[in-house]
């Protein structure tokens, strides 16, 4: 048992069940045609960082706890006088998850975080971009179990983008349904 490598639950499920299901449903002739998850990008926009640079450090620390890896800061591309924003100022942070960390995060998102969202009815099945990628937003980062409510100074929102190798939205939707994404029934 000690020499056996750990594999995330969803990765094992993809390899053993989901690949076969998608191959049967879409009739792929080649194993490499079967859609798979490529990466998950988590982005936090911290507009308040313009006035107080300590807020970006707090957001980065929280995002590091959620993702399990160190985020990078995102900088403003252009100056906007109305927001007192200059080009190059730090306005947020993001992290890109791949391989095992991606599957671990997805498991926590589906089984723990989304059910804890207030008034959660399901994810919109129309939030695909036309190329097989899914984008969603969370208003509160405190739905993740890694965040202790008593130790945070502010509640942040985040964008979560799931990038797949699927060519169409229908293929990506079926892939995410197989991963038990809680889509709203149309």
UniProtKB/Swiss-Prot annotation:
The keyword Ribonucleoprotein applies. One of its GO terms (molecular function) is tRNA binding. GO terms for cellular component: ribonucleoprotein complex; ribosome. The keyword tRNA-binding applies. Belongs to the universal ribosomal protein uL5 family. Pfam families: Ribosomal_L5 (PF00281), Ribosomal_L5_C (PF00673). The lineage of its organism: Bacteria, Pseudomonadati, Pseudomonadota, Alphaproteobacteria, Caulobacterales. This is one of the proteins that bind and probably mediate the attachment of the 5S RNA into the large ribosomal subunit, where it forms part of the central protuberance. In the 70S ribosome it contacts protein S13 of the 30S subunit (bridge B1b), connecting the 2 subunits; this bridge is implicated in subunit movement. Contacts the P site tRNA; the 5S rRNA and some of its associated proteins might help stabilize positioning of ribosome-bound tRNAs. Part of the 50S ribosomal subunit; part of the 5S rRNA/L5/L18/L25 subcomplex. Contacts the 5S rRNA and the P site tRNA. Forms a bridge to the 30S subunit in the 70S ribosome. This is Large ribosomal subunit protein uL5. It comes from Phenylobacterium zucineum (strain HLK1). InterPro entries: Ribosomal_uL5, Ribosomal_uL5_bac-type, Ribosomal_uL5_C, Ribosomal_uL5_CS, Ribosomal_uL5_dom_sf, Ribosomal_uL5_N. Keywords: Ribonucleoprotein, Ribosomal protein, RNA-binding, rRNA-binding, tRNA-binding. One of its GO terms (biological process) is translation.
């Amino acid at each position: 048992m000690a020499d056996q490598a750990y594999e995330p639950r969803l990765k094992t499920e993809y390899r053993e069940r989901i690949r076969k299901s998608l191959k049967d449903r879409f009739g792929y002739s080649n194993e490499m045609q079967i859609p798979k998850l490529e990466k998950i990008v988590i982005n936090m926009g911290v507009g308040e960082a313009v006035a107080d640079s300590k807020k970006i450090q707090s957001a980065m620390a929280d995002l590091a706890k959620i993702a399990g890896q160190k985020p990078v800061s995102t900088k403003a591309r252009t100056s906007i006088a109305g927001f007192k924003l200059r080009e190059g100022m730090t306005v947020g942070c993001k992290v890109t998850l791949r391989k095992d960390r991606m599957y671990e995060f997805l498991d926590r998102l589906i089984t723990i975080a989304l059910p804890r969202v207030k008034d959660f009815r399901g994810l919109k099945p129309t939030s695909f971009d036309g190329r097989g990628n899914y984008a969603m937003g969370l208003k509160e980062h405190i739905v993740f179990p890694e965040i202790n409510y008593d130790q945070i100074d502010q509640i942040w929102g985040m964008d979560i983008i799931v990038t797949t190798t699927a060519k169409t939205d229908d293929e990506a939707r079926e892939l995410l349904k197989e991963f038990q994404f809680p889509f709203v029934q149309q």
